[in-house]
Amino acid sequence: MSALPFVRVRQHVNPLAQKYLTPANPLEWEKVYSSPHQPLHLDIGCARGRFVLQMAQVEPRWNFLGLEIREPLVIEANQFRSQLGLSNLHYLYCNANNSLQPLLSSLPTGILQRVTIQFPDPWFKTRHAKRRVVQPELVQDIANYLAVGGVVFLQSDMEFVAVEMCDRFAANPAFKKVGSGEWLSENPLPVATERETTTQNRGEPVYRALFERIS
């Protein structure tokens, strides 16, 4: 397998810019996955997609969908997936804040069983808070389509981002936080993101939480 060139892109993209306001079209799931009725893991803000790339190999009986707003990264990730011949993995260029409903509404009921949102752009300035990915509307979209018993895994190396994400899921009656402590000490998934590994290698904290859809 030949190596792909490393694509350079802007680190931060404003999701409220005009070019990102058009929602994604629904997918034809039977053309995307070889076994479209397997449980689906949705990774929101997948960046270069290495996390779900590894997950798709570790868990072949799951399907994986990575959403990313930076199109060059999606093109690169899908090329890499094709080289590996993975038929349970797909990447989609879209703005998750306006595309979840049209995407997920076409799924068979109960298929979406796991969602991850890991190390999203923090958008430090208060006036940019609406650019953060976890808005109440996104939480509701997930609640509408995640199977009962399905889970949402959140993590960040910025405590204020993790707190805000948790507060927004906790405010939705469809979700219940798993565990008694404020943060999970370990990642419950078998694969760590590159950002997670780098942060831990520096001896810095990662703030993690797990929510379950209960109703």
Swiss-Prot record:
Protein's pathway: tRNA modification; N(7)-methylguanine-tRNA biosynthesis
Substrates-to-products reaction catalysed: guanosine(46) in tRNA + S-adenosyl-L-methionine = N(7)-methylguanosine(46) in tRNA + S-adenosyl-L-homocysteine
Root EC class: transferase
Annotated binding of substrate, by residue: 125, 157
Entry GO CC: tRNA methyltransferase complex
Gene3D superfamilies: Vaccinia Virus protein VP39 (3.40.50.150)
One term of GO molecular function: tRNA (guanine(46)-N7)-methyltransferase activity
Residues of the active site: 121
Record flagged with keyword tRNA processing: yes
EC number: 2.1.1.33
Source species, domain of life: Bacteria
SUPFAM superfamilies: S-adenosyl-L-methionine-dependent methyltransferases
Xref: HAMAP family: tRNA_methyltr_TrmB (MF_01057)
Functional summary from the UniProt entry: Catalyzes the formation of N(7)-methylguanine at position 46 (m7G46) in tRNA.
Protein name: tRNA (guanine-N(7)-)-methyltransferase
